[in-house]
Amino acid sequence: MNTDLKIAQAAVLEPIDKIAQKAGIPEEYLELYGKEKAKVNIKLMETLADKPDGKLVLVTAINPTKAGEGKSTTTIGLADGLAKINKNVMACLREPSLGPVFGLKGGATGGGYAQVVPMESINLHFTGDMHAITTANNLIAAILDNSIFQGNPLNIDPTRVTWKRCLDMNDRTLRDITIAQKKKSNGVEREDHFVITVASEVMAILCLSKDLQDFEKRIGRAVVAYTYDNQPVTVNDIQAAGAATVVMKEAINPNLVQTLEHTPTFIHGGPFANIAHGCNSVIATKMALKLADYVVTEAGFGADLGAEKFLDIKCRLAELNPSAVVVVATIRALKMHGGVEQENLDQPNVEAMLAGAKNLQKHIETVQSFKLPFIVAINKFAKDSKEEVDALLTWCHENNYPVAEADGWAKGGDGMLDLANKVVDITDHACKYQPIYDVNDSIETKITKICETVYGSPHVEFSELTNTKIQDFIKHGWDKLPVCMAKTPLSLSDDPTLKGRPENFVTHITDISVSAGAGFVVVYTGNVLTMPGLPKVPAAVNMGIDESGETYGLF
């Protein structure tokens, strides 16, 4: 079978205005970026206010291998499958970050015959939203440092600047730097830090804003530093909210593309799920719900990260009520959780796979704790043995878990028909999801409830630094915000080497920070990096342009 790139390059795309017409988007709200992609003006929402919402289906997964387990592929394939059974459907995805594209994981446009296109463009720059987010973030940083340099009228303590610069690239050398060295004319020398753009608060704010005016309010209250007398300094205080919003004027509008089978798809926003909240924008999701009867979306990594934040942060804020959850599992990831090493995952091992099913079971229990109907999707890989797939199907049936095989990678929508029909069945029953915690709970209680209910961690240890900051956050009223856990995606615990379903383990809360603009408190567990590094052999070294002008090496 061809590579993802070859399949995408061979695809015949429909003009994007035709895709918009299929989605019910009038031409006057379409802002074309060539023939294959467009932005949809947010003003369209004003005309859709009286339309009922469609059904929202969340795709999540078990704890993944480092290569990922195909949530995007399943999301896209399921949307195509629903379209094939004559449902009015849209998909909502996050925009890929260039860091992982050139690093290790790759893009987020699906795989095989379940892809969104134009694949190359989506993975590389797209409509410029990442650039706008990076620019808005770094504009705030520049205005902040300029204020300190120009007499420091706000009495900012340079050692307590919390706003970090960002770049949409994996570059470990920028994690800890010193700026304004050597000359006083360069500014006030201080320690600084870069995060990857998708971990920035601007990205989170974009994805949680309801419109451009809401974005300006949110960015204005974002905390950038503290004064010498321990008072927070905001973007409004340094008078940068208006300029940052101007930069984001076009980026606030969702991006419209299509799947290989021409299903309309929004791609908008892309916060990391192990650091930020891991969901596409509220704007795109709510617009899709007005346009389609079924909206399929994904949340990053496993249910312990993306799904928890989707339900406890995004849905609570945006007043969304999901109709069902698809839990993606792969034979190879289950074998990893059953003790098989990465290099041996292609070898059949039913015993290890069933041992690793405890990880799947925990994620199912997490979804059940939110009071939502679910179905397990076995995302098939070419090297899965029939014995392994049959054993997993039997395990699901014995535990009364709804299950379907998903073969979108090899067959597109045709490989997702069973899953599509079963998703329709489970969404026919009205449900009301229940968050894990109340926002009025204390910070400690919110964290503990997540650790106990979602991770299965009976013990939570708070560092002295965290306890001190919690008392400070209470004074500012930040203790009533939702919490956004920063944790390794590779384990239910904060230790990436603990596979399966760990028991009797401790979750270590090392630090907290406030994202007052986004509207949550970030809680750090273990050692989480906000600026990734490149692997020993980055994917980038195998990429290029051939003599015919075609890209190669991009998956």
Identify the function of each model-found stretch:
Residues 1-555:
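Flexible phosphate-sensing "switch/lid" loops adjacent to ATP/NTP-binding sites
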